Amino acid sequence: MKRTIYLYLILLFNFFNLTAQQQKSIDHTLQLLNNNSVPYISVQELNEELLKGEVLIFDTRKKEEYQVSRIKNAKFIGEQLNTDSLSLDVLDKDQPIVVYCSIGVRSEDLGEVLLKKGFTNVKNLYGGIFLWKNKGFEVFDQLDRPTENIHAYNRFWGRLLKSGNKIY
């Protein structure tokens, strides 16, 4: 009987622990994993910049994530600064650039690389494409059509995506 109660308490503890883990926000995750080496831009600010048409936006996720959906006009640059389809040498070093990934962790790494290469106006999208979609902004598929599909990276990170269809 004591063993059954003990097992029940362990299961109950694990359930509440898992629930608490799932409730951790993007804010908390970024505080834990980022070092703020690249200035942030909010999803609202990025939307305004995109309407003006004066910003380059780089998707720093894996190719399969980019193929599911992306922010309008985002260029694929990948996690390892894939410049096959983009030459950084021809870009103005003062050109406004925004990097993003799922929530803003991988994009901070690529933002640091761009800053080290001499780019002076690089920002990291706070909350990445997940917060972008959670706030109701559109994402687009490979054919530049609006889509509800978002590559959620994996089930652990996908818990931070509250809007759209999660694709794994």
How should each PLM-predicted stretch be described?
Residues L51-G53, K93-D94:
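Residue-level preference for short coil/turn positions at secondary-structure junctions
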Residues D59-T60, Y100, L125:
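Active-site-adjacent beta-strand anchor residues
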Residues L46, E54-R61, A74:
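Short hydrophobic beta-strand that contains or immediately precedes a catalytic carboxylate
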Residues S102-R106:
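Gly/Ser/Thr-rich loops at beta-strand to alpha-helix junctions
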Residues Y6-N17:
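Bacterial N-terminal signal peptides
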Residues K2, L18-Y40, Q67-Q95, E108-Y168:
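Rhodanese-like catalytic fold shared by cysteine-dependent sulfurtransferases
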Residues L56, P96-V98:
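Structural motif
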